[in-house]
Amino acid sequence: MRFPDCGRKDLKYPEWTPVLKNELSGNVGMLELIRRKDRFIHVPYHSFDSYIRILQEAAINKEVKSIKTTLYRLAKDSKVVKALINAARNGKKVTVVIELLARFDEASNIDWSKKMQDAGIRVIFGVEGLKVHSKITYISMKTGADIACISTGNFHEGNARMYTDYMLMTAAKNVTRDVSLVFDFIERPYSPVRFKELLVSPNEMKQKFSRLINEEIKNKQAGKPAYILIKINHITDPVMVKKLYEASSHGVRIDLLVRGNCSLITGVPGVSDTIRINGIIDRYLEHSRIFIFANGGDEKMFIGSADWMPRNLDNRVEVIAPVYDPEIKADLKRVVEYGLKDTLQGRVVDGTGENRPWISEDKTAFRSQEELYKYYLNENRIKD
């Protein structure tokens, strides 16, 4: 569904052409670039074509044994599916986990499923009793140098032009191993699986997030750096809300970017004094989930598909991945910090429903989406 074109260019936003990152657009293949170091794209500021290139290269690479991916929503003329079909025709073992209960996309997903099955792709229709909402791709290599992509959003070209989403591309063995185990869990539902790196629901995600918050409380009590920064769509899970209140009651600083539903109330004496929440509504739908914990000065960062809602943490297969690369961690921090100081499109989320504009101490105007786009443009010129 797209907004109709009324022929009024003066009512449209100026064009922001997605940046094709120089480091991902040279003669070196995407698979080799990812093997060298972790990579990322932040759509729609960056071009989604980088991910499509991964699939297109994997489809013809003789070292690729198999490709597994989850699909939740698909574009009408999906290059993602076309690349997967090409891979199957080239003899790769391709497995697609597609969610037939993706709201508003049921008919489209059924149609694509038939086309993929006709091409020889193994199609799995989710897990009984759970909705598969994770956004992961796993590419198995004959050499053992496997590759994984973990995204906060759908592998959907249309969404990638309108939703802000983050994608991590990695060859780190501990992470790729865990991603392969997620597919094992989906293929053999409810089998016992232990994940070393990933936070996976409904297995242990809520417990692991709770432990991360507990560490911030301990560090605050020990006089170490302690804070929590989260960018998310919704926070309504009672357990996670109580954990944030508990951390705040111990003096842990908590800064949140929440676009949608939020059960937290800020400024309650002794309960949520140290919590502040900003919400951004702008030209792009804020959709990425980013989690940052001070960890005593050695920050831990994560990205993934899960909001803090009961349905995500208890009734869906969701994946949150750690981020270790210093460059990517710096960018994640920038994204959250820019959002927290957005005075033009940001609004105070305080439980009153007033949606008061966010006003900085120095009263300067700052629009986070525009500033991020400018940053990525300039960064690309510098690295050219």
At which residue positions do the language-model features occur?
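N-terminal localization/anchoring segments of enzymes in phospholipid and broader phosphate metabolism
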Residues: M1-I228, E246-H250, C262-D384
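Hydrophobic alpha/beta core scaffold segments
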Residues: R253-L257
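Glycine/threonine-rich ATP-lid/beta-loop region of ATP-binding domains
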Residues: P238-V241, Y245
